[in-house]
Amino acid sequence: MFSRDLTIAKYDADLFAAMEQEAQRQEEHIELIASENYTSPAVMEAQGSVLTNKYAEGYPGKRYYGGCEYVDVVEQLAIDRAKELFGADYANVQPHAGSQANAAVYLALLQGGDTILGMSLAHGGHLTHGAAVSSSGKLYNAIQYGIDANGLIDYDEVERLAVEHKPKMIVAGFSAYSQILDFPRFREIADKVGAYLFVDMAHVAGLVAAGVYPNPVPFADVVTTTTHKTLRGPRGGLILARANADIEKKLNSAVFPGAQGGPLEHVIAAKAICFKEALQPEFKAYQEQVVKNAQAMAEVFIARGFDVVSGGTKNHLFLLSLIKQDISGKDADAALGKAFITVNKNSVPNDPRSPFVTSGLRFGTPAVTTRGFKEAECKELAGWICDILADLNNEAVIDAVREKVKAICKKLPVYGA
């Protein structure tokens, strides 16, 4: 028998110390990684609940194990809320991650060797959209589209590639593209060549849920997303679709038993909470502020002479090219880290450096917006970053910025009383 009083602090001091240090880091550092956010205490509570004890292979009402009557309720709540949130007819809440959701889509609708047309990783796409190092680039014939000299997707070029290569599936989505995707145009191109349209909205799902970014569900054959990032839930995946019995059956089979075994019902419960939070009016205000904050930061960088890829942002993220300054993303990342500002190095178009070094930084505002930053704080923050980038080896500047970061983080904590 377990005692409910046996906490991690009492049982495993070493692990507890590391967890406490991470909690302190999150409170004292400014988080600007575009794919990161902070979950609510309710989301974390669900993930640490008794639901972690239950195996539930199958789907609600059709399980391979007994004793699933209550986890069926949990999973159905998550399904129903996801469908309501995104206006979908179908939702599968079982994928353990976004990459696994994407793999399940490919497994459901493609055969090995089929051609897919996705956005190049070097131009802002994602590993799972056909990158050579990913299974999506190894199992399928991956053709890649990119951005033009203005940093924008050239839809005429996408159409030309589609007509030339006749893909079985067109993938629309990104990990580092700051503009609005034209879903009707993608649909038009897919229809022209008889391809499935698959949209990976992992980065913008929260914006979509709040109505501040176009919803791909009415246009795509299938949509995937993560449930963290802008959606601000647990780490996990989600698949959505319009009504299509054949596609729904294939997707369900591809997730289980095709790609996964038992679902993580404690994480699915956390997803249900996340979807409920996203259905509240205040979530729309939060997402609107996320975009305003990203735009405010980008404007400061442009005014200070830095190159923002695509000339600005219309979502939660943007790429900063440091080619002109001859600064590597790796060095910039390290210098900002000393000042308690967390970013990630990122390749930029026509990057002369390797993906392990890069010539750019990716910025995102979901996390700072969660802790209460508005345009004024984000402009000030962008200015501090510019000061460091202007002289990476100036320890006095880094020290001064770090003190400012600690002060603003104390003023705007992640988790209040």
UniProtKB/Swiss-Prot annotation:
(6S)-5,6,7,8-tetrahydrofolate binds at residues 121, 125-127, 354-356. Its cofactor is pyridoxal 5'-phosphate. One of its GO terms (biological process) is glycine biosynthetic process from serine. It comes from Pseudomonas fluorescens (strain ATCC BAA-477 / NRRL B-23932 / Pf-5). Belongs to the SHMT family. The record marks 228 as: Plays an important role in substrate specificity. InterPro entries: PyrdxlP-dep_Trfase, PyrdxlP-dep_Trfase_major, PyrdxlP-dep_Trfase_small, Ser_HO-MeTrfase, Ser_HO-MeTrfase-like, Ser_HO-MeTrfase_PLP_BS, SHMT-like_dom. It is found in: Cytoplasm. Its EC number is 2.1.2.1. Pathway: One-carbon metabolism; tetrahydrofolate interconversion; Amino-acid biosynthesis; glycine biosynthesis; glycine from L-serine: step 1/1. The modification N6-(pyridoxal phosphate)lysine is found at residue 229. Homodimer. It catalyses: (6R)-5,10-methylene-5,6,7,8-tetrahydrofolate + glycine + H2O = (6S)-5,6,7,8-tetrahydrofolate + L-serine. GO terms for molecular function: glycine hydroxymethyltransferase activity; pyridoxal phosphate binding. CDD domains: SHMT. This is Serine hydroxymethyltransferase 1. Catalyzes the reversible interconversion of serine and glycine with tetrahydrofolate (THF) serving as the one-carbon carrier. This reaction serves as the major source of one-carbon groups required for the biosynthesis of purines, thymidylate, methionine, and other important biomolecules. Also exhibits THF-independent aldolase activity toward beta-hydroxyamino acids, producing glycine and aldehydes, via a retro-aldol mechanism.
